Amino acid sequence: MEVMSHLVHWVFLAVYMYELNAELISHLHPPEQEISTDSCVFPFVYADGFHYSCISLHSDYDWCSLDFQFQGRWRYCTAQDPPKCIFPFQFKQKLIKKCTKEGYILNRSWCSLTENYNQDGKWKQCSPNNF
């Protein structure tokens, strides 16, 4: 318990000295959270953008908002959380039948959330099991 007390003091000191965003710190070392049975809301608005799937923005783990406009209510995502990839989907002049790295500047696998990515532009990163 003493170690946790010291950690809390260091975090508060870092926030004070470096004016760090407390929201960033809370996501990096999240507090114990009760398991939420509330459903993720897709799309949701966070950090001036629409998100159509779980995100890891400001966090080490994927999470989602429980409200359309993020208001601080969130939960960690699971493999059962929607939305699912849609296969096949249209990307540029190709019909894509599985997760692809094509066109992603970070060279990560992604998929479309609709049958026509060119038209809708809705996508998510693929998980190891292509959920």
From Swiss-Prot:
SUPFAM superfamilies: Kringle-like (SSF57440). It comes from Mus musculus (Mouse). One of its GO terms (cellular component) is extracellular region. Belongs to the seminal plasma protein family. Residues 35-79, 80-128 form the Fibronectin type-II domain. Epididymis. It is found in: Secreted. This is Binder of sperm protein homolog 2. Residues 1-22 form the signal peptide. GO terms for molecular function: heparin binding.
